From Swiss-Prot:
One of its GO terms (biological process) is endocytic recycling. This is Syndetin. Component of the endosome-associated retrograde protein (EARP) complex. Acts as a component of the EARP complex that is involved in endocytic recycling. The EARP complex associates with Rab4-positive endosomes and promotes recycling of internalized transferrin receptor (TFRC) to the plasma membrane. It comes from Gallus gallus (Chicken). The keyword Coiled coil applies. Residues 82-104, 198-226 form a coiled coil.
Length: 949
């Protein structure tokens, strides 16, 4: 270590600090020339390598100025020195020293250069001091001129930008950025006013004004587009643009003009399109026609699609208006919320102005609702009345009514209007159509009735008119038909308006495919009874048991007292069924014909039309009543009219029924079809409202005794009329609900005087069967051959009683045969039996009245015969009491009355004819009445008969 230190001392090694201190002062330095400096700068060095060497120097060497480098290096030497390691370490230190010295040299060169620059600066400063006074004023002048030129350049650039603004404005208009275009134009006008001292600005101002007017025109066009297809973003831009222009109220006035024009243009284009499409290549210039004249060129085939498209197009216009109002309501609410949140006094004036504009817009929009709807009504009215719809198909006309009804619903939701214009126009068309339609249907009904064979139409026992397609519309309207689970949903759906439902898409006037084809009417049965074999056997057994001879009954009872066979039914069970409703009356299908079903369907169609268009309810109900009237009149004419039996005076046809039939004949039946057609116009018009009387089909035979003179056909006809009356009774609440209050007396009269008389038609219809089914004339002949002036009381009844009972047994057999073809309701069976028994009893009285001589024993024989007849008859029928039983008994017993009692009896019993009373008095002569008394009694009879003459 001592060797190394001494070696370093001898070599005169110094620290870098000492080397720096020994540098000569700057004054003694020789300034290098520019060439030397350039050469020193251009010497190639590797900065990266140099930096790596410097970085390898330990930081301890630079820690402080008092650091002893020699001591530090000596202390780092290892205890055992190696010459090779020392040399390597020395070389490393040399590299580090060389690198550091190079930096020092570089710093020295930099300092020398700085000294040269400073010297040059001092020299130039001295020169500047000498020249500053001469050039300073010139410099300031140039600077001022420069500033002025910069300002001029800025103005020229602004003017240039203003000149080129029209390009940007055109782009913004193409982009439909109307607020931005107006704002830019207004800013340009404001900027142009700043440079009005330039001569080119006046031309620019004129150009900007023209541009602003052009923007307003395009803005008006954009506003008109709202009328057919409302777009929120588009309308928001338009309103913002008008607000920038300060023309909010003007915009609203223009908007209503555009809506009015849109309605006119829309309907004209729709109708024109269909007219040109149907006209083909004709040369007619339809574009020049007025809308009213154009509507008359619509063909029947294109009428419905054109109407649908017309309503769809008008819906779009009204929907746009609705959405416009909705936009303003939402916008006003947003603005009100904004104003309430910002309470700045400086904006009070602007707020009041905006409030006034909003109030004006709101009133204008509300007033415009009725105006627009009125325009829509007038356009649709013109279209409706432009074509005669009287020859349209029913479904097509119902579709027209449905569309107009939907349109009126739109009007009510749109502005609360009752659509009087539409109602009146569609009422005219409906009445006109319905008269033609009803006239055709009446002619069809006459044709059906004249071709009707009165066969049973097999429908199911569960048949209900609501199952028919024509009455489907009633199912939705009846609350009981809606299940409780569906009621909340339906209630919610009813609160949603059409505008809310179709606000975001769709159209309420889209033609829906008729779903009727997808539905099936499950009303027809494979047979008329739709019952199982047990029910059929019970029904047939009942038929055969209800009115059979006593022998068959006795066998039947005997069977029941023994072992009952399988599927047998007790007589008590059958009788209880009979008392309830003639066996399967309730469980079986109703009795009706194809014609009846057609009338019911027709009534459904009439009600469907009435439901859609309530203003013509009275006309529809009046025509419905004519359908029932004609059906009733036809049944009476075919099966109930018989002047011979009407003259019996038994009151078969009630006064109400006769009044009804006379009214129908006078108001509905054309009795002059075969007469000379020449006559007054008034008579011809009246006859147009009438229908010829129907004629019974030649296929229906009413003269055959084996079929009980067409009893099956009579039952089907009469009971189908009763069924039809029941359906009218069922529909009465629905008809009453739509009938105008002023016309309700007509409906009440129709039900009380016409519908309720259907049951009364049974008597005259079945009376004819009862009058022909039993040979009453033969019974009179047999009674005439009986000797009544016998002297002893007889114990055996006369043969005419057995003959009459055989007639009843034969009647029962035929009735049973008929019941196999057609179910005979209990009430019909009872009426037939009542008629037969009443006629038989009256025939007995007639026979007794023909007796010339009769003794007391003969009267007793009459009582014996009648009691025998009653006893046997009561076994054939369950009807109690026997009709006209007292009529016979009273007449027989009157023989025994004294003079005074008989006179009183004659005055009290006016149900007997003059012949009956006269014969009674004559037979009693010589027995207990003398001639004087006879004259007195005959005079009393004459007094009673005189008012009848």
């Amino acid at each position: 270590m001592q060797k190394i230190k001494s070696l370093m001392t001898r070599q005169g090694l110094r620290s870098p600090q000492e080397s720096v201190h020994d540098l000569s002062p700057i004054e003694n330095l020789r300034f290098p020339t520019k060439e030397e400096l350039r050469e020193s700068w251009e010497e190639p060095t590797d900065p990266q390598a140099q930096q790596e060497i410097i970085n390898s120097i330990e930081e301890v060497y630079f820690s402080n100025d008092a650091f002893d480098i020699v001591k530090y290096e000596l202390e780092r030497l290892p205890p055992v020195l190696s010459l090779q390691e020392l040399e390597e370490y020395r070389d490393k230190l040399k590299q580090q020293q060389a690198a550091e010295l190079e930096r020092v040299t570089s710093l020295q060169n930099g300092l020398q250069l700085a000294a040269v620059i400073c010297a040059d600066g001092r020299r130039h400063l001295n020169i500047a001091k000498e020249g500053f006074t001469q050039t300073s004023l010139g410099l300031l002048a140039n600077q001022r001129k420069r500033q002025l030129l910069i300002g001029l350049l800025k103005s020229l650039r602004t003017i240039k930008t203003l000149q080129r603004t029209d390009v940007r404005l055109s782009e913004m208009l193409e982009e439909e950025d109307y607020p931005g275009a107006i704002q830019l134009c207004l800013e340009c006008q404001k900027a142009a006013s700043t440079f009005k001292h330039y001569s080119c600005i006046s031309e620019l101002n004129s150009k900007l004004q023209d541009t602003l007017e052009q923007i307003e025109e395009q803005l008006d066009v954009a506003l008109s587009k709202i009328c057919k297809n409302f777009d929120i973003n588009h309308y928001t831009k338009v309103q913002q643009a008008y607000r920038l222009l300060g023309k909010t109220q003007t915009a609203m006035d223009q908007l209503h003009m555009h809506f009015t024009q849109a309605i006119h243009n829309t309907v004209f284009q729709v109708v024109l399109g269909y007219v040109e499409l149907c006209a083909g290549n004709t040369d007619t210039k339809f574009q020049k026609l007025q809308y009213k004249d154009l509507c008359t060129h619509i063909t029947s085939d294109s009428y419905i699609p054109c109407l649908a498209d017309l309503c769809k197009a008008l819906w779009e216009v009204m929907l746009s208006y609705y959405r416009t109002m909705q936009w303003h309501e939402n916008h006003d609410q947003d603005e009100a919320a904004t104003v309430s949140s910002v309470s700045d006094g400086s904006s009070v004036v602007g707020t009041e102005e905006n409030s006034f504009d909003r109030s004006y817009v709101k009133k204008k929009l509300e007033h415009g609702l009725s105006r627009i709807w009125q325009d829509v009504q007038l356009k649709v009215k013109t279209y409706l009345l432009g074509t005669d719809l009287s020859n349209f198909k029913y479904d097509d006309f119902i579709f027209v009514l449905d569309v107009i009804s939907r349109l009126m619903q739109v009007g009510e939701e749109f502005c609360g209007s009752k659509s009087e214009v539409l109602q009146e126009s569609i009422r005219k068309q409906s009445v006109n159509y319905f008269k033609t339609y009803h006239r055709t249907r009446l002619e069809e009904l006459r044709m059906f009735l004249e071709n009707e064979t009165w066969e049973l139409c097999p429908v199911k026992s569960s048949f209900d008119i609501l199952q028919l397609h024509e009455f489907k519309f009633m199912v939705q309207s009846r609350s009981p038909s809606v299940s409780p689970s569906k009621q909340p949903a339906s209630a919610i759906s009813t609160t949603v308006t059409l505008f809310e439902q179709y606000c975001n898409g769709g159209n309420p006037f889209e033609i829906q495919a008729d779903s009727k084809d997808d539905e099936t009417e499950d009303v027809l049965a494979s047979n008329g009874y739709e019952s199982d074999e047990q029910e059929k056997s019970a029904y047939q057994e009942y038929d055969s048991d209800s009115d059979v001879p006593e022998e068959l009954k006795r066998d039947y009872v005997d069977e029941q007292t023994g072992d009952a066979p399988m599927k047998s039914v007790s007589r008590e069970t059958l009788r209880s069924r009979k008392k309830s409703d003639y066996s399967l009356n309730k469980g079986n299908a109703p009795i009706l014909t194809n014609t009846t079903l057609n009338v019911v369907r027709l009534v459904g169609k009439y009600m469907q039309m009435m439901n859609i268009l309530k203003p013509i309810a009275f006309d529809v109900i009046h025509f419905m009543s004519q359908l029932f009237d004609y059906y009733l009149y036809a049944v009476y004419t075919f099966f109930g009219r018989n002047d011979t039996f009407e003259s019996t005076g038994l009151g078969l046809s009630s006064s109400r029924l006769r009044t009804t039939l006379n009214r129908i004949q006078e108001s509905l039946i054309d009795l002059e079809v075969s007469a000379d057609p020449t006559g007054t116009l008034t008579a011809a018009e009246e006859r147009k409202e009438k229908v010829p009387s129907p004629h019974l089909s030649h296929l229906v035979v009413l003269t055959s005794g084996s079929s009980l003179y067409g009893l099956a056909e009579r039952v089907v006809a009469t009971e189908s009329l009763v069924f039809l009356a029941e359906q009218f009774e069922f529909l009465q609440p629905h008809l009453d609900a739509v009938m105008p209050a002023a016309k309700k007396p007509f409906l009440q009269q129709f039900y009380s005087q016409t519908v309720s008389t259907a049951n009364e038609l049974r008597k005259p219809v079945y009376w004819i069967v009862a009058a022909k089914a039993i040979d009453y004339e033969q019974m009179l002949l047999l009674m005439a051959n009986v000797k009544w002036d016998v002297k002893e009381i007889m114990s055996q009844h006369n043969v005419y009683v057995d003959s009459l009972l055989k007639e009843f047994e034969e009647f029962n057999r035929r009735l049973n045969e008929v019941s196999k073809r057609v179910r005979i309701p209990l009430i019909v069976s009872n009426i037939l039996w009542e008629h037969c028994m009443r006629l038989a009893n009256r025939t007995l009285v007639e026979g007794y009245a023909n007796v010339k001589k009769c003794s007391n024993e003969g009267r007793a024989l009459m009582q014996l015969d009648f009691q025998q007849f009653l006893m046997k008859l009561e076994k054939l029928t369950d009807i109690r009491p026997i009709p006209d039983k007292e009529f016979v008994e009273t007449y027989i017993k009157a023989y025994y009355l004294t003079e005074n009692d008989m006179e009183r009896w004659i005055k009290e019993h006016r149900e007997y004819s003059t012949k009956h009373l006269t014969n009674l008095v004559n037979v009693c002569l010589g027995s207990h009445i003398n001639k004087k008394a006879r004259q007195k009694l005959l005079a009393a009879i004459d007094d009673i008969d005189r008012p009848k003459r």
